[in-house]
Curated annotation (Swiss-Prot):
Underlying gene: tig
One Pfam entry name: Trigger_C
UniProt function note: Involved in protein export. Acts as a chaperone by maintaining the newly synthesized protein in an open conformation. Functions as a peptidyl-prolyl cis-trans isomerase.
Gene3D superfamilies: 3.10.50.40, Trigger factor ribosome-binding domain (3.30.70.1050), Trigger factor, C-terminal domain (1.10.3120.10)
Descriptive protein name: Trigger factor
Xref: InterPro entries: PPIase_dom_sf, PPIase_FKBP_dom, Trig_fac, Trigger_fac_C, Trigger_fac_C_sf, Trigger_fac_ribosome-bd_bac, Trigger_fac_ribosome-bd_sf, Trigger_fact/SurA_dom_sf
Free-text domain note: Consists of 3 domains; the N-terminus binds the ribosome, the middle domain has PPIase activity, while the C-terminus has intrinsic chaperone activity on its own.
Single GO MF descriptor: peptidyl-prolyl cis-trans isomerase activity
Organism in which the protein naturally occurs: Gluconacetobacter diazotrophicus (strain ATCC 49037 / DSM 5601 / CCUG 37298 / CIP 103539 / LMG 7603 / PAl5)
Length: 445
């Protein structure tokens, strides 16, 4: 094999590789002989078919197979011999030697973008702040009120009067699109709480003021991201019949309420809520310190990012941006930007992500951080639990799709590296309010 370097610019390298025709011919002949050993033809003993006949039948297929293997082997040898670490799959273009008959040397070009050399930062110099919040009585009381509101009963309002905020209107309705009733759009004795949530925007608002016995036609527009795709974004009418009014009856927050929902008493409910809130605060605290850590590491990414990786990351980000724009969910700040500015901003985010990913990977590699089989199994089990009754199918999916399993490995590895770095850093605990803990930093990770 002969190799000539044709490009060396930044992280990009280019080579011309030549594999002698004789070497290819030897591999072709060996492969044809191998096929001949198992070939059966009338008039010939098993394994005794002449090579010329084997070549006539399988020559083109073997030619392609040998060329593909030769290119793969030569490219891998090139990378190994020169100690090159590709950032992505090398690009290969055949120049000569791919013609049927295979009499010429095989010549092809290889273009590859390399991973940068990354210096190990001194992680012990990092200073981080761990935000800590404690559940207060107000938070626990609010959670108890939310539980009580879900347990409340309703009593019928005997007076015939227009429905007002806070009332529950019992209605029958028939929904139509373009004058035709649609599936799932007809129901009887539905409770609509005025001022509550759970209905299409504008639905409950137009029922306010109706009295029992009154009929009305209202018009609403389904949200663009509505779960039923055949209705998403469409205008619909609903024939409404108000049948009765009810008012909610508050439930006392006491031991009796606790027993109704399966607890021994109110104190047990308080303890459970407190543990749940503490876990929520711990998760928020970890997200905040992880963000602070990544911001600190981003300042140490003074190396070039492989542009192929940046482009691939940007493509994924931009796909989500386009989906948000189509659904009308682009945030207000992005809505005000022109296309070029928006692309430039998200390209910077893509480059930051690639650099941080490479730095974390290098820290993990240098410190022998790996993801164990047990950790992978736990991740797959957690994923399977999201699909009750289909756990076995989920396990089979990951067994047959190693790339899908790798998508679970990445976050586990990243979190292990983050934990490792936090252990080495100087961490100061800081007490904050729940509101301060919940503040969301700009989403540029």
């Amino acid at each position: 094999m002969q190799v000539t370097e044709t490009l060396s610019a930044g992280l990009k390298r280019g080579f011309t590789v030549t594999v002698p025709a004789g070497e290819l011919e030897s591999k072709r002949t060996a492969r044809l002989k191998e096929l001949g050993q198992s070939m059966n033809l009338p008039g010939f003993r098993p394994g005794k078919v002449p090579l010329s006949i084997v070549k006539q039948r399988y020559g083109d297929a073997v030619q392609g197979e040998v060329l593909e293997q030769a290119v793969s082997d030569a490219t891998r040898a090139l990378m190994d011999e020169r100690g090159l670490r590709p950032a992505m799959q090398p690009r290969v273009d055949l120049v000569a030697g791919a013609e049927p008959g295979g009499k010429a040397d095989l010549e092809f070009k290889v273009e590859v973008e390399l991973l940068p050399d990354i210096a190990q930062p001194d992680l012990s110099t990092l200073s981080l702040t761990r935000l800590k919040a404690t559940p207060d009585a107000e938070t626990i009381d609010k959670a108890l009120k939310d539980i009580a509101s879900r347990q409340r009963d309703f009593e019928t309002i005997e007076d015939v009067r227009p429905a007002a905020q806070g009332d529950v209107v019992v209605v029958d309705f028939v929904g139509k699109v373009d004058g035709v009733a649609f599936e799932g759009g007809t129901a009887q004795d539905v409770n609509v709480e005025l001022g509550g949530a759970g209905f299409i925007p504008g639905f409950a608002e137009q029922i306010e003021g109706m009295s029992p016995g009154e009929e009305k036609v209202i018009t609403v527009t389904f949200p663009a991201d509505y779960s039923a795709e055949n209705l998403a974004g469409k205008e619909a009418t609903f024939d409404i019949t108000a049948k009765a009014l009810k008012r909610p009856v508050d439930v006392e927050i006491d031991d009796e309420m606790a027993k109704k929902i399966g607890f021994e008493g109110l104190e047990q409910v308080r303890e459970l809520i407190t543990r749940q809130v503490e876990q929520e605060y711990e998760q928020l605290s970890r997200l905040r310190i992880k963000r602070e850590l990544l911001d600190a590491l981003a300042e140490k990414t003074d190396f070039e990012a492989p542009q192929g990786m940046v482009e691939a990351e940007f493509a994924q980000i931009w796909q989500r941006v386009e989906a948000d724009r189509k659904a009308g969910e682009l945030d207000e700040e992005d809505k005000e930007k022109d296309e070029d500015t928006l692309r430039a901003d998200y390209r910077k985010i893509a480059e930051r992500r690639v650099k941080l990913g490479l730095l974390l990977a290098e820290i993990g590699r240098a410190n022998a951080i790996t993801v164990s089989q047990d950790e992978m199994l736990q991740a797959i089990r957690a994923e399977a639990m999201r699909y009750p009754g289909q756990e076995q199918q989920v396990f089979e999916f990951f067994r047959k799709n190693p790339q899908a399993a790798e998508s679970l490995r990445g976050p586990i590895f990243e979190n292990k590296v983050v934990d490792y770095v936090i252990e080495l850093a100087t961490v100061e605990d800081k007490d904050v309010t729940p509101e301060e803990l919940a503040e969301i930093p700009p989403a540029d990770l």
